[in-house]
Amino acid sequence: MEWVWALVVLAALGSAGAERDCRVSSFRVKENFDKARFSGTWYAMAKKDPEGLFLQDNIVAEFSVDEYGQMSATAKGRVRLLNNWDVCADMVGTFTDTEDPAKFKMKYWGVASFLQKGNDDHWIIDTDYDTYAVQYSCRLLNLDGTCADSYSFVFARDPNGFPPEVQRIVRRRQEELCLARQYRLISHNGYCDGKSDRNLL
């Protein structure tokens, strides 16, 4: 009879996974998000890609808050054009507050015209401000409230990544966003470091 109980347990686990609520409106964000503590340099460690041409790796973002409490960001990273031309490019974003301090509208554009531009939701799903942050954006909703075109970043303060206990937290947040195993790791090999004008846009 032990195998029967094993099947029951597996079925229950499978049912629990199948019943995960993937409607965007159900996703939890960081409570009492503090923009000032979040400001500074963040290194992208992993990314769930959207549709369109965005920065691909070596992504470093700098968030800042001005004297009026307005948050903005710049990001630099590598982009591959025409399948064989690597360039370093910059993107800029400005944030509009909403009723929830962890949910923003982000207007963004590339300094180079070939990069994607838009005005998307930008949610801070979780952060401890000192080690990690998980960001999420849904650009297009399905009729059932799930997301048809989303992107998400996992950021770190340290370009070398996270300790194991933080990795476990990040994985849980990815699962809660219904994006488990949909992220790709982002390399940091120094391609866009320095002031060289080689392949800069």
From Swiss-Prot:
<comment type="similarity">
    <text>Belongs to the calycin superfamily. Lipocalin family.</text>
</comment>
<dbReference type="GO" id="GO:0005615">
    <property type="term" value="C:extracellular space"/>
</dbReference>
<dbReference type="InterPro" id="IPR012674">
    <property type="entry name" value="Calycin"/>
</dbReference>
<dbReference type="Pfam" id="PF00061">
    <property type="entry name" value="Lipocalin"/>
</dbReference>
<dbReference type="GO" id="GO:0016918">
    <property type="term" value="F:retinal binding"/>
</dbReference>
<dbReference type="InterPro" id="IPR000566">
    <property type="entry name" value="Lipocln_cytosolic_FA-bd_dom"/>
</dbReference>
<dbReference type="GO" id="GO:0034633">
    <property type="term" value="P:retinol transport"/>
</dbReference>
<keyword id="KW-0813">Transport</keyword>
<protein>
    <recommendedName>
        <fullName>Retinol-binding protein 4</fullName>
    </recommendedName>
</protein>
<dbReference type="InterPro" id="IPR022272">
    <property type="entry name" value="Lipocalin_CS"/>
</dbReference>
<feature type="modified residue" description="Omega-N-methylarginine">
    <location>
        <position position="139"/>
    </location>
</feature>
<comment type="subunit">
    <text>Interacts with TTR. Interaction with TTR prevents its loss by filtration through the kidney glomeruli. Interacts with STRA6.</text>
</comment>
<feature type="signal peptide">
    <location>
        <begin position="1"/>
        <end position="18"/>
    </location>
</feature>
<feature type="disulfide bond">
    <location>
        <begin position="22"/>
        <end position="178"/>
    </location>
</feature>
<feature type="disulfide bond">
    <location>
        <begin position="88"/>
        <end position="192"/>
    </location>
</feature>
<feature type="binding site">
    <location>
        <position position="116"/>
    </location>
    <ligand>
        <name>substrate</name>
    </ligand>
</feature>
<comment type="function">
    <text>Retinol-binding protein that mediates retinol transport in blood plasma. Delivers retinol from the liver stores to the peripheral tissues. Transfers the bound all-trans retinol to STRA6, that then facilitates retinol transport across the cell membrane.</text>
</comment>
<keyword id="KW-0964">Secreted</keyword>
<dbReference type="InterPro" id="IPR002449">
    <property type="entry name" value="Retinol-bd/Purpurin"/>
</dbReference>
<keyword id="KW-0488">Methylation</keyword>
<dbReference type="GO" id="GO:0019841">
    <property type="term" value="F:retinol binding"/>
</dbReference>
<keyword id="KW-0732">Signal</keyword>
<keyword id="KW-1015">Disulfide bond</keyword>
<feature type="disulfide bond">
    <location>
        <begin position="138"/>
        <end position="147"/>
    </location>
</feature>
<keyword id="KW-0845">Vitamin A</keyword>
<dbReference type="InterPro" id="IPR022271">
    <property type="entry name" value="Lipocalin_ApoD"/>
</dbReference>
<dbReference type="GO" id="GO:0034632">
    <property type="term" value="F:retinol transmembrane transporter activity"/>
</dbReference>
<keyword id="KW-0683">Retinol-binding</keyword>
